[in-house]
UniProtKB/Swiss-Prot annotation:
The active site is at residue 404. PANTHER family: UROCANATE HYDRATASE. This is Urocanate hydratase. The gene is hutU. GO terms for biological process: L-histidine catabolic process to glutamate and formamide; L-histidine catabolic process to glutamate and formate. Binds 1 NAD(+) per subunit. Signal peptide: none annotated. Pathway: Amino-acid degradation; L-histidine degradation into L-glutamate; N-formimidoyl-L-glutamate from L-histidine: step 2/3.
Length: 549
């Protein structure tokens, strides 16, 4: 059993600069037991999304970062440190490529063969790019999605409404709190009792039961009283959902965040106990997958029937529709995706999951940055509400962090403000600034972020590559290009960026460029596809697009 990994706190450097210290601490933070789903196996979240290929690679990365100079760049190939090159101080300290395969070979079957041979690693999105911050990292996006549902169909609130979902892993675990933040009631089905316990411990889930009747009783009481409540139901969605249909119980909203993007490692079939399923997964993966496919069909057919009976349903980006379609559910895509339905207008403005982490380890540093957000953007009541709720309801996992959806212009303004706070000594230590790959201009994913693009450009993967190259050119601290995050191998290409606000003048220049250009590529991507909000945002911020000048 490997040692317990936790990032160092405070102002004592163990590397040669804060730029490399930050990379080391964030790698370690991804494997903090408070943060990672299965740290002993280097798994952070999302099925088998890992921080490093194996423990030898992890320790060698740490060792290399401690020696890395300010004009050198470490290259990471699928979680393995492969080279250090002399570059320059404006270059990233780390460049990462995870899980990338030539398209013809981009299948789970081939990927798994390579992984068994020790040649590749699944990096998910923020697992292999060292900027995962725990479930908070997806919380505001989930909150924004359910708020958009409420705004579109229920007058702006989920009060008195029942939401049904499944999956309480590191991503799906945000759903219960996001629903109750919107004043709704949610039943979240989960097969793994450990995940339910983890959500209760971290404050994302109110209560749990292993009895459907009890879950419905609790939900009915809360709905009648108009109070928010989140209920974890220990069970299997492929059994619970059809039973609800059989009883004629149709929730107001239905979605799903099981890890169906990885059928072998992420989805547990019905008709077998959880413990037996884990055993079968190892001993007979072919039989296991047969059972998974049968369960996914039942799961999605039940959601489709709920949709026909009036429920507002959407897929939450786990590619379960495609899996169901491939196994006989011809109308699986009658279920809309959440991005075109609820998030695309935000992406067109450049808004997305901006995040920052206090390297000091002190919550006070995050609270001070929260106050800075309110000083700069306090006229936005929705944003004020988010910061207020986050302070009250989000428990720290690993290094204290904050997620805050900011748009074009706002991210650069906030980044520069935090750098100035570090320079003046208002914060104890530098701040790491990053984002999810699930952002406005950094993903090509036809079943999620780029589903149903206005111009039909869903599958064009040039955009995340341009995004990554631009961030390298702009002075980011580390940049990553991944494949298969969110929706699974073969279905997405995406890029990540991190920059460290250390209070220096050089970093001030880098921050202004990176945080303007990174999000600006999202505006450009959507403007190029014909979205009027993005076109107007580009004009407002003086973004030069030769074909639109």
């Amino acid at each position: 059993m490997p040692e317990v990994i936790r990032a160092p706190r405070g102002t004592q450097l163990t590397c040669k600069s804060w730029q490399t210290e930050a990379a080391m601490r964030m790698l370690m933070n991804n494997l903090d037991p408070e943060v990672a789903r299965d740290p002993a196996n280097l798994i952070v979240y999302g099925g088998k999304g890992k921080a490093a290929r194996n423990w030898d690679c992890f320790y060698k990365i740490v060792e290399t970062l401690k020696k890395l100079e300010n004009d050198e760049t470490l290259l990471i190939q699928s979680g393995k440190p492969v080279a250090v090159w002399k570059t320059h101080e404006w270059a990233p300290r780390v460049l990462i490529a995870n899980s990338n395969l030539v398209p013809k070979w981009a299948t789970w079957e081939y990927f798994n063969e390579l992984e068994v041979r020790g040649l590749i690693m699944y990096g998910q999105m923020t697992a292999g790019s060292w900027i995962y911050i725990g479930t908070q990292g997806i919380l505001q996006g989930t909150y924004e999605t359910f708020y958009a549902v409420a705004k579109k169909y229920f007058g702006g609130t989920l009060k008195g409404k029942l939401v049904l979902t499944a999956g309480l892993g590191e991503m799906g675990g945000a759903q219960p709190l996001a629903v109750t933040m919107n004043d709704g009631v949610v039943i979240a089905v989960e097969v793994d009792k450990r995940m339910i316990d983890r959500r209760i411990q971290t404050g994302y889930l109110d209560t749990w039961t292993d009895n459907l009747d009890e879950a419905l009783r609790l939900a009915k009481e809360a709905l009648k009283e108009g109070r928010p409540l989140s209920i974890g139901l220990l069970g299997n969605a492929a059994e619970v959902h059809p039973e609800l249909v059989r009883r004629g119980i149709i929730p107001d909203v239905v979605t799903d965040q099981t890890a169906a993007h990885d059928p072998l490692n992420g989805y547990v079939p019905a008709g077998i106990s959880f413990e037996e399923a884990l055993k079968l997964r190892k001993e007979n993966p072919e039989k296991y997958l047969e059972m998974v496919y049968d369960s996914v069909v039942k799961h999605i057919e039940a959601i489709l029937e709920m949709q026909r009976q009036g429920a507002k349903v959407f897929e939450y980006g786990n590619n379960i529709r495609r899996l169901a379609l491939d196994h006989g559910v011809k109308d699986a895509f009658n279920i809309p995706g959440y991005v075109p339905e609820y998030i695309r207008d935000l992406f067109s403005e450049g808004k997305g999951p901006f995040r920052w982490v206090a390297l000091s380890g002190k919550p006070e540093d995050i609270y001070k940055t929260d106050q800075k957000v309110l000083e700069l953007f306090g006229e936005d009541e929705h944003l004020r509400k988010w910061i207020d709720m986050a302070q009250k309801k989000v428990k720290w996992q690993g290094l204290p962090a904050r997620i805050c959806w900011l748009g074009q212009g706002q991210r650069a303004e906030m980044g520069l403000a935090m750098n100035e706070m570090v320079r003046k000594g208002e914060l104890e230590a530098p701040i790491v600034i990053g984002r999810d790959h699930h952002d406005t201009g950094s993903v090509a994913s036809p079943y999620r972020e780029t589903e149903a693009m206005k111009d039909g450009s869903d599958a064009i993967a040039d955009w995340p590559l341009l995004n990554a190259m631009l961030n390298v050119a702009s002075g980011a601290t580390w940049v990553s290009i991944h494949h298969g995050g969110g929706v699974g191998i073969g279905y997405s290409i995406h890029a990540g960026v991190v920059i460290v606000a250390d209070g220096t003048e050089l970093t001030r220049q880098k921050l202004e460029r990176v945080l303007t250009n990174d999000v600006g590529m999202g505006v450009v991507r959507h403007a190029d596809a014909g979205y009027e909000i993005a076109i107007q945002t580009a004009k407002k911020h003086g973004i030069r697009m030769p074909m639109m000048d």
